[in-house]
UniProtKB/Swiss-Prot annotation:
Regions crossing the membrane: none
Keywords linked to the UniProt accession: Activator, DNA-binding, Nucleus, Stress response, Transcription, Transcription regulation
Induction and repression of expression: By cold stress.
Biased composition regions of type Low complexity, renumbered to the chain: 134-153
Protein's UniProt name: Dehydration-responsive element-binding protein 1D
SMART domains assigned to the protein according to its UniProt record, in alphabetical order: AP2
Entry keyword Zinc-finger: no
Bias (Polar residues) ranges: 1-22
Family recorded in the similarity comment: Belongs to the AP2/ERF transcription factor family. ERF subfamily.
Main subcellular location of this protein, as a coarse class: nucleus
Function, in words: Transcriptional activator that binds specifically to the DNA sequence 5'-[AG]CCGAC-3'. Binding to the C-repeat/DRE element mediates high salinity- and dehydration-inducible transcription.
A molecular function GO annotation: DNA-binding transcription factor activity
Pfam families cross-referenced by the UniProt entry: AP2
């Protein structure tokens, strides 16, 4: 009995020594969790080819996937996945990029059983059209000039911007500014100026006595100060004065 126990103990010891500490990894394909992208849907890494591959699952079927293609970058493969899903699911597709719906313009394609779906062809075609769009700074000079000319012709007219000489002004004294603002407040639609230099900046005054007092206080604090405003439009100057008035009103409350 003791001999059998000793023999079994030696057998277990020899088997434990023969077994490695870490089991060998089974040969074959790597798991999907280890090769898929951490952010993009339907994007996997193929290590042997060194490229990103795209496969999409057919809606309404269990386990059926269609091979779309391979790309060098994960972003390009994600665009391919979006194009294929738009062709398969339409507006209800789960996309990697929010702008793929209007940027790719993919038509809805029905899935044909047993054949490669038109979704793959639509995805490839739309991705090729998306690649043809020149990136900023990579196009030719003539194309960039023509594009800038078209943008300039279609752009809305911008507000006039005054030069540095036109925008330079000196604030008046407190008494003179109060007399000037009293004349402006007398009319509901009066327009005035706080400048003495050439080309003064005209802006609408708020018909409110308390606002006039606040403006008078601001000018009193900034008395005899030369202010240089470079390339500011009239609207920006008005917004600046309004912001100062608002902060001063909050401070006095």
């Amino acid at each position: 009995m003791e001999k059998n126990t000793a023999a079994s103990g030696q057998l277990m010891t020899s088997s434990a020594e023969a077994t490695p500490s870490s089991p060998k990894r089974p040969a074959g394909r790597t798991k999907f969790q280890e090769t898929r992208h951490l952010v993009f849907r339907g994007v996997r890494w193929r290590g042997c080819a060194g490229r990103w591959v795209c496969k999409v699952r057919v809606p309404g079927s269990r386990g059926d996937r269609f091979w779309i293609g391979t790309s060098d970058t994960a972003e390009e493969t994600a665009r391919t996945h979006d194009a294929a899903m738009l062709a398969l699911c339409g507006a209800s597709a789960s996309l990697n990029f929010a702008d793929s719906a209007w940027l790719l313009h993919v038509p809805r394609a029905p899935v044909v059983s047993g054949l490669r779906p038109p979704a793959a062809r639509c995805a490839t075609r739309c991705l090729q059209g998306h690649r043809r769009v020149p990136a900023p700074g990579r196009g030719s000079t003539a194309t960039a000039t023509a594009t800038s000319g078209d943008a300039a012709s279609t752009a809305p007219p911008s507000a006039p911007v005054l030069s540095a000489k036109q925008c330079e002004f000196i604030f008046l004294s407190s008494l003179d500014c109060w007399m000037l603002m009293s004349k402006l407040i007398s009319s509901s639609r009066a327009k005035g100026s706080l400048c003495l230099r050439k080309n003064p900046i005209s802006f609408c005054m708020v018909t409110n006595s308390y606002t006039a007092l606040l403006l008078e206080y601001i000018i009193l604090q900034m008395n005899s100060m030369i202010v240089l405003i470079h390339e500011l439009s009239k609207y920006q100057v008005f917004l600046l004065l309004t912001m100062i008035t608002h902060h001063l009103f909050q401070w006095r409350r």
